[in-house]
Amino acid sequence: MSETRVRYEKKDHVAYVTMDRPAVLNAMDRRMHEELAGIWDDVEADDDVRAVVLTGAGDRAFSVGQDLKERARLNESGVAPTTFGSGGQAGHPRLTDRFTLSKPVVARVRGYALGGGFELVLACDIVIAAEDAVFALPEVRLGLIAGAGGVFRLPRQLPQKVAMGYLLTGRRMDAATALRHGLVNEVVPAAELDQCVADWTDSLVRAAPLSVRAIKEAALRSVDLPLEEAFTTSYHWEERRRRSADAIEGVRAFAEKRDPIWTGQ
């Protein structure tokens, strides 16, 4: 039996998801997508998990995206090329179109985040990049399309002209430029990357877990709604939060001048 493609660990309320094919710069084949889908299912179901760190093994790449050698073999065998989203493909729904994942995902990026790797980054909630990180959607140079969300998310996260420049040319973006455009939260030297990620996950874990889930859901679901409609829309995790013991505990702890004890209930 071949080795697993993804390492999955949990510690202190944080799930660590590592794409583990460093010899091919963590290129994603169908088996990796299948493993990741099972992991995302577990992350959502496990109430002890309050945050996720997604990264790639080694120091050369977060992920260079689709395994193009596998794609070439599939093309030769008559398997239809992919288009938008992961419907009908291995590992559906993938993170890029798993719109109900309520836990915050932190991308830890070293080296290349290209194609589907960059699309994963765009789907994360917080992005911490090393100074050597490089981002690009090179599909246009390969007769492909950034169908795992790149063509949709990049124009939502950048000014339109800036996004179109990268989408239509496949040009690369360095970490400093990504920070300037607001695509990443912090850029740090590689030696400081793990500590910076830990600082962010510590903050997430200290926060009320139901509040985190409610805020993520409401913020992402409402982003394209008219403001009046956003206020009147019902949000599942906000209904859970406002009826929770944690909603009482947080205020009580503040009044009693102590740290809150979150139960997620």
From Swiss-Prot:
Q: Does the entry feature the keyword Lyase, yes or no?
A: yes
> Per the record's keyword annotation, is Membrane included, yes or no?
no
Task: Kindly state a single biological-process term from the GO annotations of this entry.
Answer: vancomycin biosynthetic process
Query: Which GO terms label this protein's molecular function in UniProt?
Result: enoyl-CoA hydratase activity
Tell me the pathway.
Antibiotic biosynthesis; vancomycin biosynthesis
Q: Which NCBIfam families match?
A: EnCoAhydt_DpgD
Summary of the function given for this chain in its UniProt record = Involved in the biosynthesis of the nonproteinogenic amino acid monomer (S)-3,5-dihydroxyphenylglycine (Dpg) responsible of the production of vancomycin and teicoplanin antibiotics. Catalyzes the syn-addition of a water molecule across the double bond of a trans-2-enoyl-CoA thioester, resulting in the formation of a beta-hydroxyacyl-CoA thioester. Physiologically, DpgD could act as a dehydratase, facilitating the aromatization of the DPA-S-DgpA or DPA-S-CoA intermediate. It can use the non physiological substrates crotonyl-CoA and beta-methylcrotonyl-CoA.
Q: Which family does it belong to?
A: Belongs to the enoyl-CoA hydratase/isomerase family.
Q: What is this protein called?
A: Enoyl-CoA-hydratase
Native organism: Amycolatopsis orientalis (Nocardia orientalis)
- Upper classification of the organism: Bacteria, Bacillati, Actinomycetota, Actinomycetes, Pseudonocardiales
